[in-house]
Amino acid sequence: MPPCCRALCEDTTVEKQILILLAAYKGGRFIRPMVDSILAQDVGGWRLILSDDGEDTAPILQEYADKYPDKITHYRSGRRFGSAQKHFMHLLEQFGGQADYIMFSDQDDVWHPDKVRLTLRLMEQ
């Protein structure tokens, strides 16, 4: 393995604050695998902001926020955004200044356990 790849793969220390934004819309059937994949990350230092723009995801998002209050926030704006872009922009306005780095997740993503660590290392190069 090349030295640059070895360093990325072996370093599990994260000292930066990372905010992961997830804007969901009628994503009830996708949310659990997505959130579980973030919870399975091999580094800490992240906080997940879950926001929904539809009816079926709110109870699931709240369940996760209640279970993992130190890692997950269920943000309820009370607004309908009409597009993922507007929803994410609103989340950036509300939370963007609270972290060193921001990552975005779609509701139907499933992240590899090393995604946060490897992405952060690449961003810092």
Question: Where do the PLM segments sit?
Answer:
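Nucleotide-sugar donor-binding/catalytic module of glycosyltransferases
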Residues: 5-125
